[in-house]
Amino acid sequence: MTQTTESELREKYLDLLSQQFDSPEKLATEIVNLESILELPKGTEHFVSDLHGEYESFQHVLRNGSGNVRSKINDLYAKTLSQKEIDDLAALVYYPEEKLKLVKNNFDSKGKLNVWYITTIEQLIDLITYCSSKYTRSKLRKALPKEYTYIVEELLYKNNEFNNKKSYYETLVNQIIELEQSDDLIIGLSYSIQRLVVDHLHVVGDIYDRGPQPDKIMDTLINYHSVDIQWGNHDVLWIGAYAGSKACLANLLRICARYDNLDIIEDAYGINLRPLLTLAEEHYNGENPAFKPKKRPDKPVGLSKLEESQITKIHQAIAMIQFKLEMPIIKRRPTFEMEDRLVLEKVNYDTNEITIYGKTYPLKDTCFSTVDPQDPGKLLPEEEEVMNKLLLSFQQSEKLKRHMSFLMKKGKLYLPYNGNLLIHGCIPVDENGEMESFEIEGEQHKGRDLLDVFERHVRYAYDYKEITDDLSTDLVWYLWTGKYSSLFGKRAMTTFERYFIEDKASHKEPKNPYYYLREDVDMIRKMLKDFGLNPDEGRIINGHTPVKEIDGEDPIKADGKMLVIDGGFSKAYQKTTGIAGYTLLYNSFGMQLVAHQHFDSRDKVLSDGADELSVRRVVDEELQRKKIRDTNDGKVLQEQIRILKLLMHDRYLN
């Protein structure tokens, strides 16, 4: 069989393309359209990170576009509406269903309510006109409420210059009200505005962790119009569990037990924890203080005595299973350099002490009833059976399968995008800022090359989830806890010490030098270059570590080359940071960093109009307004134009 030449392939490709563009007029129209789009201002990118399962806080930031909605309202109405009216209009756009109920309760006559409907619909139409001013009509149409697209387009493109259609427009709105469609229209318009103020969302890691509703965040992202994800350490932990790593699964369950979030497993994903509870009831007591679950801020009533006791037992059972499961990985992978984490082998079970990193510590709150001192890494038959059942349930959960599939489809370890590098954790470096090497399959890898190899193994483990002890599956676990992991970014994970050793000095997890060298402009420039980006214009946009503004830490580092935007959604960190974190907006005029205050509830926003935002800081302003031509999407369009012009020349101009 003869091979097809490159020239023949080109001809076949052009043949296929000419079926779609079967006349020079059609082809010219498409080229004109694409060339024109290149001249539009670039859309607004919205960067969020470290959501940690905090669905309500994330929803608020998403709905207000990190203050972008209010900014547009202020632009239009600062001189004509009072602050209270602006607050009410903003709350309506954020939470249209709830705000409508409150508004309607305030009117004592239908006539007054109808006047409000007319005014509000007009304001929302004006807002859509303003928010969509840099989009094509085609793109705008996709953002409009489907059921009302025709009506909304008529109102958007109305022209009263000659006064010929005044009564036509009035009748349109009046009939909407008379037919009781105004609530649905207002709701649809509000969601259109939310969509129009943000063109693309970047989630820079950690959708999962200690928060109660990561599943709802995943459902939101699946339905979002344009999104990408850079995996965080907790996201990879969930991917690893689904991909067959029992060590990842045990870690994940332990964290859920610790933060009283086992309902994510049982209720959200439909996984039966009864076998684990039965095992825990048999071997552990419910009073061990080190394993009592943390109190949840969103559960003011708290747990019953029985619930607390059961979770405490589960917490101990899964922690001991985790320590056992990690041992064979460490032993079969010497290049991981993790022998220090063979903790159960370092315990003296007679004296109840451990010798670790050259120092001996007494142990407290121990729960070693299932550990064989002669073979500490050996699982009991019932422990093995429980983990097999849990892994099977995990991999058979339809909802979890959908969520993990989306994480793999939209997610990567890092993303170069519009000249910037988006990464959740770090690029491992030594004390001199030189990129650290890590050996995988006999070869040394560092920087971008290391991250590419890590990602290949994550994808392989996911594709072959029935294999649970191969290198790829072990490397997913290593990404969670290893010292050369770009996601962990520390020298060791001291989980055992935190449970069982009083001396807090043993709890310390020294960070990779990256975190104290990221003020170094030269190091950041070198990294940008390694990832194929322009070091003069590019930036690293980083999540993972909360910015301690309370201590004067600045999220803008290395002369603006490094931006740290841990969203601070996790309520546990807000006492140490002083704020609820940062998000970032990047539009055609430049970048703005937005600091967020603690988010109380949507009820407070609805009643008080509070936006929970503080100052925006301009990171930079573009000397020339950025166009679509200057973006990743622009490069794709330019390549399409090149091919279409080739077709025009080849088929119609000869």
From Swiss-Prot:
Task: Cite a single GO MF annotation.
Answer: fructose 1,6-bisphosphate 1-phosphatase activity
The UniProt entry, under Gene3D superfamilies, shows:
3.60.21.10
What InterPro entries would the database entry show?
A: FBPtase_class3, Metallo-depent_PP-like
The record's catalysed reaction(s) read: beta-D-fructose 1,6-bisphosphate + H2O = beta-D-fructose 6-phosphate + phosphate
- Entry keyword annotation includes Manganese: yes
Q: Note the superkingdom of the native organism.
A: Bacteria
Kindly list the biological process annotations in GO that this record carries.
Answer: gluconeogenesis
Lipid metabolism in keyword set:
no
Its keywords, alphabetically, are:
Carbohydrate metabolism, Hydrolase, Manganese
Q: In which pathway does it act?
A: Carbohydrate biosynthesis; gluconeogenesis
- Pfam families documented for this protein: FBPase_2
Q: Which cofactor does it need?
A: Mn(2+)
Top-level EC class, please? Answer: hydrolase
Please state the Enzyme Commission number of this protein.
Answer: 3.1.3.11
Family stated for the protein in its record? Belongs to the FBPase class 3 family.
Please give the name of this protein: Fructose-1,6-bisphosphatase class 3
Q: Which gene encodes it?
A: fbp
